[in-house]
């Protein structure tokens, strides 16, 4: 009598033996001469199971170690409309996909909603230890009866709900891969790196949710998210949620003129750099321009002078004294509001901290000291903080209402995250947030500013009407940035493809678990069929799983 094929998990892969009948499963399998068995990538688990079930193939699933969990929230909160829409879109996509929401738009609560509607053992992956502890605190409060653990920062728990850093999850991917039915990738733009992607590739999780404010990557690898998690299923911008889930906000760009001495020195340095670039036939605007400049600068004395000139010119633009005069005036105008100051480098952070007696946070700040500073800021003991990059991602400071960018990179992600630091409403009614972007006029900073705001063309053209030139450190008059109320109408789900579908069917989607008799002929055990059924017609994500008890 032929043996029933068995599916096993083996260090990030699947082994199916003996080979079952049918052909559908062969699209995912590769013969492994070392073990004389067929091996399948773990990420193909769902597709493989669906293919076997479609051909009515009996098999024993010993790969799956995830299981249903009882998630009863301690407090029911009414979600914002965009959270309801995003959850419905994710369900319609088969509970696989990426949701793009601005910072502070409630991505954590959306993940909680996804966990409640898909109550399985769940792995949440985050980029930093600060975020790991924030998620842990949220989940412990949300599900007091659930077992929540940590993986990272010295913790090595294995619990039904596990919060892990990307680094730790990647290191343990071979053993975590079959333990969790749902994986939530927070800040999922971190996933498609050579090191981190194994978290998704070595996992059999049939349900996957990616969360990010800016999933796009400069290396183009964000396209891999379609395979690792699923396609983008929902997107909203900060402007779409202003005054609703997010605080009303306005953005003001202040252009500062260099002093005469700074201008003369800046022009001299830029000329030195440009002469070398012209001689070497290098264009910094080309795809490989910067890399070629770095390589050529190491080969000659003139190249080294050009690189040093470039760096000094950049330092002048980033740290001009005019910016500090503007900063002092902005701090005085907005006192006693909570203010976050962002710079591109630690040297400027420490200069501001020392000259203006403002608490500073950089990557060099000890964790205990960082937590103490942030706690005092939240409690109102500190009104102002200055930081470089460490507050860009994942730090919850809802009390902040003013952000001042003195310098930064051309990254749209960094810009979005810095804006998001002041958009969180918290418990503040009618919060009005404002972002100041202070830019040195007629310097490379103007191009950097244009890139991070998505204005890639005509970066040397005059700035928009909101931008104002301030030669003597005066604070400009602000212009209203309030977005007009959207037209009321039929609720729609907007997909990444631009297509729209009515939520009528999505609102009926529920996930139900039922047991039934298995078709397996194994008389020594009873198989439990764990099914996901919807009240609406089945779509690509309808999925049934079989395990042997």
Q: Predicted regions: what is each one?
A:
Residues 1-85:
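Accessory DNA-engaging acidic/polar modules
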Residues 94-115:
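Walker A/P-loop
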Residues 149-151, 156-157, 340, 347-351, ...:
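Conserved helicase ATPase core of P-loop NTP-dependent helicases/translocases
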Residues 152-182, 193-198:
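Conserved helix/coil segment N-terminal to the catalytic DExD/H
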Residues 190-248:
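Post-DEXD/H (motif II) to motif III coupling segment of the RecA-like Helicase ATP-binding lobe
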Residues 288-361, 370:
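Conserved helicase/translocase motor-coupling segment
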Residues 393-408, 434-437:
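A short beta-strand element within the Helicase C-terminal
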Residues 422-449:
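Conserved segment of the helicase C-terminal RecA-like domain
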């Amino acid at each position: 009598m032929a043996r029933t094929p068995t599916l096993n998990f083996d260090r990030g892969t699947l082994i199916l033996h003996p080979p079952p009948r049918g052909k559908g499963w062969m699209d995912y399998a590769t013969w492994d001469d070392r073990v004389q068995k067929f091996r399948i990538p773990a990420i193909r688990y769902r597709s493989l199971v669906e293919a076997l079930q479609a051909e009515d193939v009996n098999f024993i699933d010993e790969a799956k170690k995830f299981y249903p969990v009882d998630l009863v929230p301690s407090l029911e909160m009414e979600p914002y409309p965009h959270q309801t829409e995003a959850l419905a879109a994710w369900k319609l996509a088969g509970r696989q996909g990426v949701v793009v929401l601005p910072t502070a738009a409630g991505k954590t609560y959306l993940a909680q909603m996804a966990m409640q509607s898909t109550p399985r053992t769940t792995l949440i992956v985050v980029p930093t230890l600060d975020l790991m502890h924030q998620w842990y605190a949220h989940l412990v409060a949300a599900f007091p009866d659930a077992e929540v653990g940590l993986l990272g920062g010295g913790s090595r728990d294995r619990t039904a709900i596990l919060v892990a850093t990307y680094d730790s999850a990647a290191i343990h991917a071979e053993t975590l891969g079959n333990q969790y039915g749902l994986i939530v990738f927070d800040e999922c733009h971190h996933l498609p790196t050579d090191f981190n992607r194994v978290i998704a590739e070595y996992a059999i999780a049939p349900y996957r949710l990616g969360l990010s404010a800016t999933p796009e990557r400069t290396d183009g690898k964000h396209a891999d998210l379609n395979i690792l998690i699923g396609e983008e299923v929902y997107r909203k911008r900060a402007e779409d949620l202003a005054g609703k889930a997010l605080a009303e906000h306005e953005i003001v760009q202040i252009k500062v003129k260099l002093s005469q001495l700074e201008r003369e020195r800046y022009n001299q340095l830029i000329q030195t750099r440009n002469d070398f670039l012209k001689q070497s036939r290098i264009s910094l605007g080309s795809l490989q321009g910067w890399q070629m400049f770095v390589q050529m600068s190491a080969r000659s004395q003139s190249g080294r002078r050009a690189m040093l000139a470039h760096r000094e010119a950049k330092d002048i633009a980033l740290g001009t004294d005019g910016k500090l005069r503007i900063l002092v005036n902005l701090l005085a105008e907005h006192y006693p509001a909570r203010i976050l100051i962002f710079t591109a480098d630690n040297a400027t952070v420490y200069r501001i901290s020392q000259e203006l007696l403002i608490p500073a946070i950089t990557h060099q700040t000890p964790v205990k000291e960082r937590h103490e500073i942030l706690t005092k800021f939240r409690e109102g003991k500190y009104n102002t903080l200055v930081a470089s990059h460490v507050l860009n991602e994942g730090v919850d400071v809802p009390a902040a209402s003013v952000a001042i960018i003195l310098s930064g990179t051309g990254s749209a992600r960094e810009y979005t995250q810095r804006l998001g630091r002041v958009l969180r409403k918290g418990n503040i009614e009618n919060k009005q947030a404002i972002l100041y972007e202070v830019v040195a006029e007629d310097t490379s900073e103007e191009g950097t500013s244009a890139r991070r705001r998505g204005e890639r063309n005509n970066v040397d053209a005059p700035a928009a009407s909101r931008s104002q030139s301030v030669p003597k450190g005066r604070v400009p008059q602000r212009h209203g940035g309030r977005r007009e109320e959207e037209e009321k109408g039929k609720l729609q789900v907007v997909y990444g493809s631009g297509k729209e579908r009515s939520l009528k069917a999505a609102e009926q989607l529920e996930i139900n678990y039922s047991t039934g008799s298995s078709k397996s002929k194994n008389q020594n055990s009873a198989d439990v069929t764990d099914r996901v059924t919807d009240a609406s017609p089945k779509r690509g994500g309808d999925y049934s799983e079989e395990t042997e008890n």
